[in-house]
Amino acid sequence: TFPVGAKLDLAAGREYMFDRVYRQQPERFYTTDMHGVDWDKMTAAYRRFLPHIDNNYDFAELLSEWLGELNVSHTGGRFYPKGQSEPTASLGLFFDWNYTGKGMLIAEVVEKGPFDTANTRVKAGTVIEKIDGVEITPDADYYTLLNNKARKKTLVSLFDPQTKEHWEEVIIPITNGAFSDLLYSRWVKQRAADVDRWSGGRLGYVHIESMGDDSFRSVYSDILGKYNNREGIVIDTRFNGGGRLHEDIEILFSGQKYFTQVVRGRETCDMPSRRWNKPSIMVMCEANYSNAHGTPWV
């Protein structure tokens, strides 16, 4: 092996990418008139900003503004920087931000988080006093104490204001990405509880997280499993980023009962047995994107 050095002309690289977008759009745009936009004129209007851009954050914004003139979805520019130099871990907790004393007052322990275990004494109302021996003062930002702590054993010093007891526990913080997944599950569980309460147990609830296989399998399992005997189902598609699932969803929720199987005088199942045969309603919002935007219209 031997060392090799290279000098990159970043400005020339951005100009190349700009020109590539300019050439490709007329060839690939879904209508030949490009929504009536004079592409050459529009390109010239945005090209004049190019010499003044010295970073990829701004370059991505330029591409997005330029392509946005076409007034069509699924276009734009994105810049993905390298990962954080010091990613901050999560304890899987919500805190009471009105609390003004020392430490952090826990408002909620998130289900399946680091403190949601059988051997912890932490609960809502517990105060975290220290993290790895560093005291949390009212004017301190406790997040810095969790830098680079994901998946690493961390000592947490705790206090119960009711019993006046102090103790310590060792936990393993999770990444913020993992915490986001827990918050999503928490949100779905809360929405399902709302529907169950408001309908008096008559309706089920499922959320389609994305238009992909994993989401479909989860929805399929719930509607033909725990919600199989409900009178109807609420299908929530809000905040779904898309994929390609509209045909599968249409088939799954458009079943028409044609037969009821009876065994020894008892109804055992309806046919089709692998499709939803009862009423359903689909919820959407402005944050639905791509295939998730189109699916409610199917």
Give the predicted meaning of each segment:
Residues 1-76, 187, 191, 217:
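Sequence signature of WD/YWTD-type beta-propeller architectures
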Residues 86-138, 213:
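PDZ/PDZ-like domain segments forming the peptide/carboxylate-binding groove
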Residues 22-47, 92-110, 202-205:
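PDZ/PDZ-like groove recognition
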Residues 49-102, 165-190:
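Extended, small/polar residue-biased N-terminal targeting/export presequences
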Residues 11, 15, 26-30, 34, ...:
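Cleft-lining beta-strand/loop regions that shape enzyme active-site pockets
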